[in-house]
């Protein structure tokens, strides 16, 4: 729902997941689901935030929220900081050649400034009072920007400043799950997960973009606990694109649904969600471990990926193009012997697959094969 977030809509989304998805295989192995408020939650009162968290808990969900600790979106230098009224925003900006550092429409703030620590303390206290257990920290790169100087004179580089600020975040938010977005890869010890592809939506180009990040960043789930490939949107796309988008999520790490599931949200999006977000065989793959590209030596997004999971091997092939394509499963490249007999099933269609024959993938679609 992007910038249309309201308190009633948030409750409706929680209820939609409870009534339509959680009882139909869209949940973690412990039966939990995370419901996150994104940008816009600050229009809620504290009582509404607490009520939202309580609704999530009643629905068997864990509530999440959003914050951008190292940015000033207002860019009003003379404004007073709400959580540190002895300072104005001009006091906390990072300056380069005497000018505020600006990126993506926001000014970067100094992670070492005491006013920023005061904001962290008060924001974490608010989130904790309300009961939030998950925080998406966005636009983190602002905290790593270079500057003429920092409040703390011992800091000499942007990454030093970022590391200082992240240590403070860990101090105040260390009992919550932290998901980083638009952030440096390192230092990595302050968060559980990191988004490796941002603003991915509903089309096959979004799948290709996501898989480009996985092609060359699959290993980052060895650094963080999970890779996050951003949300999956289903409305206004073909069903093949829906399958491809969902597959791109389950083989990356975090599996996030992004349509508007409030009562006024897209009917098509809800129908597609109940159809495609509830495939038990597909959803069981989403255990937070990234697939690896089979080749990984090109300059574009790879389209074939695999993961060995005990005695089960998963093989995925995407078709990013408009026309159908045929592919022979590269048995040797995925560690299989041509002479061995294997059972193979395509998980979206449920069809049995003969691995000795070419597989046809329609345009803007995917084949997700389980081999046992």
Regions found by a protein language model. Name each.
Residues 353-372:
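C-terminal beta-strand-rich structural cap/linker in extracellular carbohydrate-active enzymes
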